[in-house]
């Protein structure tokens, strides 16, 4: 069973618009042909990014010239996807899968697939791969790479399994995606899960197993169960997002960028990106590079991605906020960038940092110890230059420099670190080490003492206890001294991190004083009648409203440092000691880590940029 007649009529594909028409036709069907679309994208990507030299020894392969916008009068060449080439690749893949899987050996009760059948398909893909190749190399995510080079990256293997299942008629097997991993769901209503690929350094022994253990340990890799369960149209969106336009470390293929942008807009118009936050962020990045007339601006798309994560995934995705922060950072919007990073940390605080969460650790490490310090350093330079030459700065540079005089910016910085510290609590792997502390002190020092002192840090737990437990003055005095940091080994651990009322910016965010502050949260205001006394008591004079933002810390480390953070002079030694100390929860769960537990070897690897 090969290509259908309606599919054949769309060939040859001579341009970007021809490829878009093919995708539009497939998306109009109930079951888009994943194998066909992946082969086409892989073919185009190979000859536009991997091998841009026009071959002369392949008689069937031709290139279509068209005018290039840059330089004016130049030509660009698009690889012509001829029917004979694509049909041969298609037939080879389907024959390989159908020849290796005997469906009669795997009865499908109720028309749904069994775990053994899914594992068998996974074995076929896995055993067809080359035994030795660099699995993180670029351009090996498509079925074109699988057929022509027997190479696939991690997510490419998962997609190939889904494509193979579709070729076998297993319509209940779909792709499941977190922000750094892929597996499959199958069975009635997609209730069953199965690992089909590796992650990180390789976990071959997990194939066929469920992801329940990863969900239960609250690791970011499995998003606590708030992962994407794709339908066929979202699987098409996944392969479009996986297009890699890079020719080398410094150059991208303009044609591939245009193709990806047009295909994402096609999916957007059909409503297939509504549940795909990272695709919306990807599209926003492309629009920032080359805006499409009449389309929403990048900022709108970034916020749509955040709204999608809130609506469909319990606001437990990290990258929608990372996309937004990266946009503001590139545009030197210091206040907005710090707020978005703080929101990112607010999401991560409800996870446990596990061994396989290294990718998001690297993202946070880079933000905290490279991006934010450099952004604040640049703002400090602009502020200093503005004081020396006040009439020579533009409005944008003045705004960037003034961020260091804004207590709300400082509150966002504290909220960012509070989320990181909370993330570490209860985690089996430590997060913070002296490298973090050094740059925290540096970033704190960018804000003057009078700016830092305008941030009011309150303790929600202390206020609630004081309101509900009318103990004596001695007990209240003990609470004012703050919780002791020592803990005994036999003490029961505190409850798990709450999942309620945790939305970014809500409950713990930096909010400017009275207008946005809910009533009853500032100590000293009337709490209402608490005894049974009927005699009216004269209300005390209203306390003056707080001058700056009000912040509630969630982590024990930041609670212990709150006086240090807003002191007139920064005590760098005390802050470093407090930040790198093991939290109470960790002391009960594991022995104190040695310095060798903290490895910086990943800094030598290439990282994704913001």
Curated annotation (Swiss-Prot):
Residues 385-404, 460-552 are annotated as: Disordered. The modification Phosphoserine is found at residues 487, 543. One of its GO terms (biological process) is negative regulation of cell cycle. Residues 393-402 have a biased composition (Low complexity). Residues 214-390 are annotated as: Interaction with FANCD2. Keywords: Chromatin regulator, DNA-binding, Nucleus, Phosphoprotein, Repressor, Transcription, Transcription regulation. Component of the MLL-HCF complex, at least composed of KMT2A/MLL1, MEN1, ASH2L, RBBP5, DPY30, WDR5, HCFC1 and HCFC2. Component of the menin-associated histone methyltransferase complex, at least composed of KMT2B/MLL4, MEN1, ASH2L, RBBP5, DPY30 and WDR5. Interacts with POLR2B. Interacts with POLR2A phosphorylated at 'Ser-5', but not with the unphosphorylated, nor 'Ser-2' phosphorylated POLR2A forms. Interacts with FANCD2 and DBF4. Interacts with SMAD3, but not with SMAD2, nor SMAD4. Directly interacts with NFKB1, NFKB2 and RELA. This is Menin. It comes from Bos taurus (Bovine).
């Amino acid at each position: 069973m090969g290509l259908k007649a309606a599919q054949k009529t769309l060939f040859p594909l001579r341009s970007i618009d021809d490829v878009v028409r093919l995708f539009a036709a497939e998306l109009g069907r109930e079951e888009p042909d994943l194998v066909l679309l992946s082969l086409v994208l892989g073919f185009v990507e190979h000859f536009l990014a991997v091998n841009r030299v026009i071959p002369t020894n392949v008689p069937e392969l031709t290139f279509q010239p068209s005018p290039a916008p840059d330089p004016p009068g130049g030509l660009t060449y698009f690889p012509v996807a001829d029917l004979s080439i694509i049909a041969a690749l298609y037939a080879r893949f389907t024959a390989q899968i159908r020849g290796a899987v005997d469906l009669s050996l795997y009865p499908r009760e109720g028309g749904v697939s069994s775990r053994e059948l899914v594992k068998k398909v996974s074995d076929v893909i896995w055993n067809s791969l080359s035994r030795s190749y660099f699995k993180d190399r670029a351009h090996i995510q498509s079925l074109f790479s699988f057929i022509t080079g027997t190479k696939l990256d991690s997510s490419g293997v998962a997609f190939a399994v889904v494509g193979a299942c579709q070729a076998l008629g297993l319509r209940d097997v779909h792709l499941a995606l977190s922000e750094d991993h892929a597996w499959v769901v199958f069975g009635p209503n997609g209730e069953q899960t199965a690992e089909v690929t590796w992650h990180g350094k390789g976990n071959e022994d997990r194939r066929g197993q469920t992801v329940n253990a990863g969900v239960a340990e609250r690791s970011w890799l499995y998003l606590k169960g708030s992962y994407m369960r794709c339908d066929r149209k979202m699987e098409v969106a996944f392969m479009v997002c996986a297009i890699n336009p890079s020719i080398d470390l410094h150059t991208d293929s303009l044609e591939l960028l245009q193709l990806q942008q047009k295909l994402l807009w096609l999916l957007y118009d059909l409503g297939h990106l509504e549940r795909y936050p990272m695709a919306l962020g990807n599209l926003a990045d492309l629009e920032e590079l080359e805006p499409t007339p009449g389309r929403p601006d990048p900022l709108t798309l970034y916020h749509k991605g955040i709204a999608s994560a809130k609506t469909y995934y319990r606001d437990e995705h990290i990258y929608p906020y990372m996309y937004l922060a990266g946009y503001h950072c590139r545009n030197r919007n210091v206040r907005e960038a710090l707020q978005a990073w703080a929101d990112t940390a607010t999401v991560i605080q409800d996870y446990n940092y596990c061994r396989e969460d290294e990718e998001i650790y690297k993202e946070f490490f880079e933000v905290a110890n490279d991006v934010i310090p450099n952004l604040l350093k640049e703002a400090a330079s602009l502020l200093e230059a503005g004081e020396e030459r006040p009439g020579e700065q533009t409005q944008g540079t003045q705004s960037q420099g003034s961020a260091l005089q804004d207590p709300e910016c400082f509150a966002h910085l504290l909220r960012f670190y509070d989320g990181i510290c909370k993330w570490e609590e209860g985690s089996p792997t430590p997060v913070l080490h002296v490298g973090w502390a050094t740059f925290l002190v540096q970033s704190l020092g960018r804000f003057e003492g009078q700016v830092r002192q305008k941030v009011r840090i309150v303790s929600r737990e202390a206020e609630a206890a004081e309101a509900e437990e009318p103990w004596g003055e001695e007990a209240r005095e003990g609470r004012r001294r703050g919780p002791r940091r020592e803990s005994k080994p036999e003490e029961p651990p505190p409850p798990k991190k709450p999942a309620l009322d945790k939305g970014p910016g809500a409950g713990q965010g930096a909010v400017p004083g009275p207008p946005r502050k809910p009533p009853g949260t500032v100590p000293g205001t009337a709490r209402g009648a608490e005894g049974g006394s009927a005699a009216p008591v004269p209300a005390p004079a209203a306390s003056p409203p707080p001058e700056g933002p009000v912040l509630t810390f969630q982590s024990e480390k930041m609670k212990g440092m709150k006086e240090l953070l807003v002191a007139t002079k920064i005590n760098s030694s005390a802050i470093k000691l407090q930040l790198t100390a093991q939290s109470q929860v960790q002391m009960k769960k594991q022995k104190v880590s040695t310095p060798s537990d903290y490895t910086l070897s990943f800094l030598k690897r290439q990282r994704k940029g913001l």
